[in-house]
Amino acid sequence: MAKKDYYQILGIPKSAEEREIKKAYKRLAMKYHPDRNQGDKNAENKFKEIKEAYEILINEEKRTAYDQYGHAAFENGYNQNNTYSTFTSSTDFGDIFGDVFGDIFGGSRNQRVKKGADLCYNMEISLEEAVKGTTKEIRIPTFQKCKTCYGMGTSTGTKPNGCSTCHGKGQIHIRKGFFTVQQSCPTCNGIGTVIKNPCRMCRGQGRIKTNKTLSVKIPPGIDTNDKIRLSKEGEAGTNGAQPGDLYVQMKVNKHPIFEREENNLYCEVPINFTMAALGGEIEVPTLDGRVNLKIPSETQSGKLFRIRGKGVKSVQSRSRGDLLCRVVVETPVNLNEKQKYLLSELGNSFNGFRGDKNSPRSKRFFDGVKRFFDDLTK
């Protein structure tokens, strides 16, 4: 009796992609699976056809051969015995439905290798270090690959043995009602191998807990909440898997003089009212040393003066921010009698506190107050 066309069995066109093949197989396999049709010989035979068609069409080489030669390409080589009962092929029912039912029934995918965990380290630095860049040494607790067994977990001269429970696959198949699902092997914990002669140093784990010292290069311009990634400096992986990464989380401590806003620095510069009125020159601090700042006459409190290039260097470019100095005019305190007299005379020379010429802002303020109360009495 001639075999049916594999494409017709799955109900797909010859141009079907891998995703369409899998989708059709899932739908038909669920419908005709023997666990759902116990005692139904027709369903059993139908499932065998579906399984056979899927295994040919999902394999690129077999599909190409089938498209060229038809069923004759497999008459001498393809074995379809025990199609559904043993589920030993690479395309078994558990593989197809594991992604759907694995979470429900506690199933687990291959756990043979597992990348090491990423680590995070919180680092505090000063503003000076953030602006200029620096190198810091840190010490972190982590898991490192065992240097005695090189991560294998076995004693010298031995190697892991294949697990007799799962035959090295790392998974076993458990019947759950109508379904047979994959689960991680309880004997080898999904690894596929067991260690009969474990390494004495790591006790078969392949890695040991230790403290690791690292040198971290901090670039100029780093800021709070920035992260520095150190590739493969996290925990060692299991069974030869690559290690994780280390992320250094930055925090720049507050400075007693400067405040940072992006790449600019701000500071307050107190001056006496004489300098504010007459002008002068004052030394101001920068992170590179002292510089002279010229104060023009008639400077008002709160005025900002910009010193270019004395801020923070950008991490992304070579440009550097500015230093902005906010002038604060101080009111003199602890005056002696002579100073009080001189200030009184100075105030009288201004024609009181509302002098039009010497205190224009005061005049505007008090004129506004007068208009406000005049409007209330109308």
Swiss-Prot record:
Necessary cofactors: Zn(2+)
Cofactor: binding comment: Binds 2 Zn(2+) ions per monomer.
Entry annotated with the keyword Zinc-finger: yes
Domain J: 5-70
Keywords: Chaperone, Cytoplasm, DNA replication, Metal-binding, Repeat, Stress response, Zinc, Zinc-finger
Cell location: Cytoplasm
Organism name: Buchnera aphidicola subsp. Schizaphis graminum (strain Sg)
Protein name, entry field: Chaperone protein DnaJ
Domain notes per entry: The J domain is necessary and sufficient to stimulate DnaK ATPase activity. Zinc center 1 plays an important role in the autonomous, DnaK-independent chaperone activity of DnaJ. Zinc center 2 is essential for interaction with DnaK and for DnaJ activity.
Cellular component per GO, a single term: cytoplasm
GO molecular function: ATP binding; heat shock protein binding; unfolded protein binding; zinc ion binding
PROSITE patterns: DNAJ_1, DNAJ_2, ZF_CR
InterPro entries tied to this protein: DnaJ (IPR012724), DnaJ_C (IPR002939), DnaJ_domain (IPR001623), DnaJ_domain_CS (IPR018253), HSP40/DnaJ_pept-bd (IPR008971), HSP_DnaJ_Cys-rich_dom (IPR001305), HSP_DnaJ_Cys-rich_dom_sf (IPR036410), J_dom_sf (IPR036869)
Binding site for Zn(2+) 2: C163, C166, C185, C188
GO BP: chaperone cofactor-dependent protein refolding; DNA replication; protein refolding; response to heat
Database matches in SUPFAM superfamilies: Chaperone J-domain, DnaJ/Hsp40 cysteine-rich domain, HSP40/DnaJ peptide-binding domain
Position of the signal peptide: none
Its job: Participates actively in the response to hyperosmotic and heat shock by preventing the aggregation of stress-denatured proteins and by disaggregating proteins, also in an autonomous, DnaK-independent fashion. Unfolded proteins bind initially to DnaJ; upon interaction with the DnaJ-bound protein, DnaK hydrolyzes its bound ATP, resulting in the formation of a stable complex. GrpE releases ADP from DnaK; ATP binding to DnaK triggers the release of the substrate protein, thus completing the reaction cycle.
Alphabetical list of Pfam families matching this protein: DnaJ, DnaJ_C, DnaJ_CXXCXGXG
CXXCXGXG motif repeat positions: 146-153, 163-170, 185-192, 199-206
Zinc fingers classed as CR-type: ranges: 133-211
Keyword Metal-binding: yes
